[in-house]
A protein has these predicted regions:
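Dynamic "connector" segments at or just before major functional cores
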Residues: 1-182, 194, 203-214, 219, ...
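Short amphipathic alpha-helical "interface-anchor" segments enriched in bulky aromatics
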Residues: 412-439
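Active-site beta-loop-alpha junctions of metal-dependent nucleic acid enzymes
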Residues: 214-236
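Conserved structural-core and active-site-/substrate-pathway-adjacent residues in large, well-folded domains
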Residues: 116, 167-169, 208, 247, ...
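Basic, amphipathic alpha-helical segments enriched in Lys/Arg and hydrophobic/aromatic residues
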Residues: 2-5, 442-464
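Acidic, metal-coordinating catalytic cores used for nucleic-acid/nucleotide bond scission
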Residues: 221, 245-254, 272-274, 444-446
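An anionic, glycine-rich sequence signature occurring as long contiguous blocks
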Residues: 196-198, 215, 257, 263-415, ...
């Protein structure tokens, strides 16, 4: 342990030795011998006189250095994140410590590649050099890291959830760049920007756990992204049967045909403008009267125009039951009515009508909004379109190729409503993980950045699933708990932070299921 010059230093060394002996790393042999308590005097024996012999003189006084903190770090947070990273199988899939540190730094505080060393230093981790970090990004881009991470995510999802249904959605990430290139192009932006952007597609399971991610040109239509992502996922994991759920933006006849020909089942949102054709029989016999929670199971034409085949015969009161053999040119359509949705739709229509009237009267200048038509150079309110929209409030449609015998209409609706999980994952990646690659310019750098975000999203979703806490609250709880390295008169020791019951519960929840206590 060291040497001591007086009884005080000896007491500190004895205490440090006891702490090491009591540690988990120190083994103990059961010899049946009771250890004898050791006593070390912190103060020397008393002298014979009160003030000593003045004639003898006093011994020179030795100054003892004050205890000082050499460093402190959030090592507990790093260990917790590294444990989840390893539990997901990423250490085995990608044997790269620098990549792991980049992923953990992205979870803790999204920042530039240059600033990663500051984040890792706060976590008590020695950071690799900037050139090593850049080489790691190149390896991630050309070394197949994304495929290996995706394979590990798939194994985790299979072990913890149901892989019979996956959810898909897209988003856009913009760049503050003046010029376009082969990847970053100006296109339809969900954030209403005119900057160059990329389109990112994300596939998740029922829990919102990421399974596949893809990057496309900024001007690529959303409908053209779902098939490449789903087919890549299907080929990577050799899946022949699963249900793909997507919103109405993915609804195109070619997409549905390609998914059906690939042997996949789908559930996509339908546009409300198709309701008059799909529900022609209902409107003929019942008008626009619906009851709250009413569900109508019918058919819808496969082509976009709806002219190839009629959806339903208005003269027949009963809705047709979709059969893939007898209705080879139609898909199954499920329509549901909700009073709550009707109230929300009516409120939105009122706002749109007010805006349209303001534009028509010239009180407000704007691009031609909904329900405004231009006739003979003058703007007019489209009363007919507004009236048709009011007849359809409260309706929501779903298109699928799943037979009613396999999945009832209520389950189709419930499966579609799980789409909020992929939207939540996108919000987490764009806000908590700052997925927008502000500092990446080349395609390889952007792809490597998205691979890190993909792995960080998997770690974040797993933390949220295990602890029940949002990522922000998890970080706010563990980050302030810092271990300290203290120098006490030459004796250097590291002391962990004190843990309360809340933190202990979080750490226990992060452990794999078999090792929790």
């Amino acid at each position: 342990m060291g040497s001591a010059r007086d009884d005080g230093e000896l007491g500190l060394l004895v205490e440090e030795a006891r702490r090491l002996l009591a540690g988990d790393a120190q083994g103990e042999l059961d010899l049946g011998i009771t250890a004898k308590a050791v006593k070390a005097e912190m103060v020397g024996p008393p002298a014979g006189v009160l003030f000593g012999d003045a004639a003898a003189g006093s011994a020179p006084r030795q100054l003892v250095a004050r205890a000082q903190v050499l460093k402190s770090c959030s090592g507990l947070l790093y260990d917790a994140l590294a444990g989840v990273y390893a539990d997901l199988g990423f250490d085995d899939a990608v044997d790269d410590e620098v990549f792991r540190d980049l992923v953990i730094a992205r979870v803790v505080e999204p920042t530039s590649l240059l600033d990663v060393d500051r984040i890792l230093a706060e976590l008590g981790r020695a950071c690799a050099s900037l050139s090593t970090r850049k080489r790691t990004l190149r390896r991630a881009s050309v070394g197949g890291y994304r495929g290996q991470i995706a394979a590990a995510c798939f194994q985790t999802a299979c072990a913890t959830g149901d892989m019979s249904l996956v959810l898909y959605d897209v988003t856009t990430l913009y760049f503050e760049a003046e010029k376009e290139d082969d990847l970053r192009k100006v296109g339809y932006s969900k954030e209403r920007r005119v900057d160059p952007q990329i389109v990112v597609g994300l596939l998740v399971d029922r829990r919102g756990f990421p399974l596949e991610i893809g990057c496309f040109e900024g001007n690529k239509a959303e409908t053209l992204t779902i098939v490449p992502i789903v087919k890549a996922f299907q080929q990577r994991h050799e899946i022949s049967d699963m249900v793909v759920v997507a919103d109405a933006g993915m609804l195109s006849s070619s997409n549905l045909r390609d998914l059906d020909e690939a042997g996949l089942r789908f559930i996509v949102g339908s546009r409300v403008t198709k309701a008059p054709g799909d529900l022609a029989s209902h409107f003929h016999w019942h008008g626009d009267f619906f009851t709250d929670g009413q569900v109508i199971d019918t058919i819808t034409p496969r082509d976009q125009r709806g002219t190839a085949t009629k959806s339903s015969d208005p003269k027949i009161k009963a809705e047709p039951v979709w059969n893939p053999k007898t209705h080879s040119r139609s898909w199954r359509a499920v329509w549901a009515y909700s009073t709550r949705r009707a109230v929300r739709d009516t409120k939105m229509l009122n706002l749109q009508e007010t805006k349209a009237r303001a534009v028509v009267t010239g009180d407000k200048s704007a691009r031609t909004p909904r329900f405004v038509i231009v006739r003979n150079g003058a703007r007019e309110l489209d009363e007919a379109s507004l009236q048709r929209a009011r007849h359809l409030v409260g309706l929501k449609g779903y298109v699928t190729n799943i037979d009613a015998a396999l999945m009832p209409a209520t389950e189709v609706i419930a499966s579609y409503h799980d789409l909020w999980r992929v939207e939540q994952s996108f919000r987490m990646s764009k806000s908590d993980l700052a997925a927008r690659p502000m500092f990446a310019r080349t395609r390889d750098a952007i792809e490597a950045h998205l691979t890190i975000v993909f792995a960080a999203l998997a770690v974040s979703r797993e933390i949220q699933t295990r602890t029940g806490l949002s990522l922000r609250r998890f970080l706010r709880t563990l980050k302030p708990l810092r271990s300290a390295t203290i120098d006490i008169n030459g004796v250097i020791a590291t002391y962990p932070p004190a843990l309360n019951t809340e933190v202990e519960a979080i750490l226990n929840a992060l452990q794999p299921t078999g090792s929790r206590h």
